[in-house]
Amino acid sequence: MSTAIWILLIIVALTAGLFGGIFIARKQIEKEIGEHPRLTPEAIREMMSQMGQKPSEAKIQQTYRNIVKQSKAAMTKGKK
């Protein structure tokens, strides 16, 4: 094979590897964020207390569930 064909094959392989790696990393990050949201009930409790509210545990859990629900809805909307 000529040198030009080898160079072309190397460029194609590197490009395919780059795009494959980006795709796999993106899917793993989406899965991780979906399973373990960055905002925890403790963080919600702290934010509410900083805003001067005295939140009940039911209010914190309701807010947390709404955030998780919105996160999952955004993930499924993005997959379409």
Curated annotation (Swiss-Prot):
GO terms for cellular component: plasma membrane. The chain crosses the membrane at residues 4-24. It is a single-pass membrane protein. It is found in: Cell membrane. Keywords: Cell membrane, Membrane, Transmembrane, Transmembrane helix. Its main location: membrane. Belongs to the UPF0154 family. The keyword Calcium does not apply. InterPro entries: UPF0154. This is UPF0154 protein Sez_1648. The keyword Membrane applies. The lineage of its organism: Bacteria, Bacillati, Bacillota, Bacilli, Lactobacillales.
